[in-house]
Amino acid sequence: MPIASHIPLPPDDGHDARPNEFDSVAAGASPAAGSVVERLDSASSVVDGVVAGFLFLFVFGSGLIHIESFPPLWFDEGWTVCVARTWVELGHYGCLLRGEPAPPSLAAHFPVVASVAASFTLFGVGVWQTRLVGLLYTLGAFLLLYALARRLYGRSIAIAALALLLLVPLKWSIHPLCVGRQVLGEMPLLCFLLAGYVCFLRSTHRPLWQAATIGCWALAWMTKAQVAPFLVASIAGTMVVMSLRGDWSVVGRLAVAMIGSWGGCRLLLYAKDWLLAGHIMPHPPVDGMTEAIALVFVPSIRLETIRYLFVSWPEYPLGLAYAAWRVGGTSGSVAKVSVEQTVQTMLLLLAGSWLAWFAFLSAGEPRYALPGLFLAA
């Protein structure tokens, strides 16, 4: 969510939220547009209910059409569905090989498999029951994105972020509504990540919300280990910024969140192993995944990913660059920053590091860019 609203935010937990000079200039430059934005941002909470209803209709209205056949169930989904079905029907967490129990192999991580298994338990085994899980996580991710953007930038910017994701064309195979129809890790990951940031906004002097933040990020870490370097960059980078400004209370909270998220993920993994003891076979190691997916230096792939990001999707890097300029422009204005400004910095670093990795190091699969694009909206 890189574009900041010119509407000053209410102070949070004793921090002073102040508009800056750029906001005043923007407001004076376009009074007609400003009045529309002001009316929207000051509207009653009924507008939020309308947005939530629209998202529900948009996600499920489009998602339930040909849910079993479009797109066809494919390799990545098949592993997860196989493990969830075998777990529900036979009690074995894995697949079958020639009728004998086998490891889960390339299935999605436990939170995704467990969600699909819960759907199978409630509604029976089938393709629509599988993909219903993806739709629920997709709706959750959109609602949390709206809630987060509304708190950080105002209602008008939150609605604009949703419009960008839903209406501005990406490659169709990675459109959130298309990915959300499938049993993949991206939408659950985004749901848990965004829930963590929403909880962090409420965590100042509130230990329960701090614990909720840690729990959400631990689930995100467990859902897709790919997020680890970017989440660490988001938190650690913000700690550096806050330490340079001498805001040590924020540095301490971020340190607790980062260490707690890692520890929480380890605890969840131990809990999973305890739960599945006697129902799972050892997972064979998969060598070479880092070189195949995460660190690729083939020139043709690098040119393709750079073209994707800066030619096909230029609004996202441009928006992040503008957000970085705004953050830099206000860095020395006050001794302490509000919790909103802290989260803005964290999201900027998270989305920026993710998209930089996609452009300059990834294997080039467009789906790898989706979390970064979603967060950059």
Provide a role label for each language-model segment.
Residues 18-20, 156, 193-211, 220, ...:
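Membrane-interface transmembrane helices that cradle and orient dolichyl/undecaprenyl
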Residues 52-55, 145-172, 190-191, 204-212:
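Transmembrane-helix signature of polytopic, membrane-embedded enzymes
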Residues 53, 57-60, 132-153, 195:
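Transmembrane-helix motifs of polytopic, lipid-linked glycan transferases
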Residues 61-66, 78-114, 118:
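Extracytosolic helix-loop segments that constitute the early lumenal/periplasmic catalytic or substrate-binding loops
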Residues 67, 127, 131, 141, ...:
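Aromatic- and kink-enriched transmembrane "portal" helix at the membrane-lumen/periplasm boundary
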Residues 86, 232, 238-339:
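Transmembrane-lumen/periplasm boundary regions of multi-pass, lipid-linked membrane glycan transferases
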Residues 135, 186, 229, 345, ...:
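Hydrophobic/aromatic-rich transmembrane helices and adjacent perimembrane loops
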Residues 199, 209-225, 236, 354-355, ...:
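Membrane-interface alpha helices of multi-pass inner-membrane proteins
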